[in-house]
Amino acid sequence: MKILIDENMPYAEALFSQLGEVTMKSGRTLTADDLVDVDALMIRSVTKVNESLISKANKLKFVGTATAGMDHVDQELMKERGIFFTAAPGCNKVGVAEYAFSAMMVLAQQQGFSVFEKTVGIIGCGQVGSYLAKCLEGIGIKVLLNDPLKQQEGDTREFTELDTLLEQSDVITLHTPITKTGEFPTHHLINEQVLNNLRADQILINAARGPVVDNQALKARLQKADGFTAVLDVFEFEPEVDFELLPLLAFTTPHVAGYGLEGKARGTTMIFNSYCEFLGTEQRAYASDLLPTAPVPKMKLDRAWDEATLHNLTQLIYDVRKDDALFRRNISTPGSFDKMRKEYWDRREYSAVELTGDESCNLTPLSKLGFMVKPTL
């Protein structure tokens, strides 16, 4: 049995080699010839699975993407060809949410505002958007939600019309898939008209899909230099980036918002377990068994936490400025976008750290943000 796997999928080689002959390759450069005689394909979002890619896939029966998003796979084609397809919904929701929160916290320091006095508008309320909303509300930050598809499906949460959310939010963070058809397409959802209507004191964060934001229109909006702030983890034509846009962004990174070690381990184990089920084997893998101990596994609070404490705690675990600096320093080198993704550091989630403290420390909200908490007597 031959299994072809994206080389940027941690733990995959060791796990899948238990099931067959494994080949690791760059997911972005896969060709039809690579899939000849391949039984199973394990990918991430950079691989577009379409008619061209699988035109020579004479034995392909299983495709798994170790990502929550599925818009890079032609699912109708999978059905037509009798190829079983699976994804890893929610695997990276924590990492993406913590990326967005890190950007908010650092900007709060730089621009001199309190995150607790801001309203955060979340566009797209699937796994990531819903998790981010839960975290923010858990620590007392006001949230507005927009997701017309969820609303149509009967989701009982309180949703806000898009125009109202754009007007009333101080921070706008995007967590939609990319769609070009249907009643609510997201391609260029944030277009020239939307951008020109945003206030100078608003912040836009895109850690979803690059084409959700019209990058040329965003560049023009930022060139007004009126204080409007944007953070991009994704680009419209990645891995190509607009070098005129980069210096205008507060923070920018090469599509790594969801690249936390826990998220990648979850994605790998989820599709490994799906493949085991597909094969009818009883083997299973668990992300928690694969993860190393965090560099700072425990911290003790000696008083009630405040916003300064929150800044320190979250930045100790993940500070978006680290990835921003690495990206800006290396992006001019050809191939650096994918190289940084491939060599990404072992970033951890808040849950890797156990916080202890007595009742006066008020640890419960921090648990809602994702930290492991252990009250002491």
From Swiss-Prot:
GO cellular component: cytosol
Gene3D superfamilies for this protein: 3.30.1370.170, NAD(P)-binding Rossmann-like Domain
Predominant location: cytoplasm
Pathway(s) the chain acts in: Cofactor biosynthesis; pyridoxine 5'-phosphate biosynthesis; pyridoxine 5'-phosphate from D-erythrose 4-phosphate: step 2/5
Residue numbers binding NAD(+): Q127, V128, D147, T176, D233, G258
Keyword NAD: yes
Enzyme active site: R209, E238, H255 (proton donor)
Binding residues for substrate: S45, T67, Y259
GO molecular function: 4-phosphoerythronate dehydrogenase activity; glyoxylate reductase (NADPH) activity; hydroxypyruvate reductase [NAD(P)H] activity; NAD binding; protein dimerization activity
Record's keyword terms, sorted: Cytoplasm, NAD, Oxidoreductase, Pyridoxine biosynthesis
Top-level class of the enzyme under EC nomenclature: oxidoreductase
Subcellular location field: Cytoplasm
CDD domains, per database record: ErythrP_dh
Keyword Cytoplasm: yes
Catalytic activity: 4-phospho-D-erythronate + NAD(+) = (R)-3-hydroxy-2-oxo-4-phosphooxybutanoate + NADH + H(+)
GO BP: pyridoxine biosynthetic process
EC number: 1.1.1.290
Assembly: Homodimer.
Role of this protein: Catalyzes the oxidation of erythronate-4-phosphate to 3-hydroxy-2-oxo-4-phosphonooxybutanoate.
Stated family: Belongs to the D-isomer specific 2-hydroxyacid dehydrogenase family. PdxB subfamily.
UniProt-recorded name of the protein: Erythronate-4-phosphate dehydrogenase
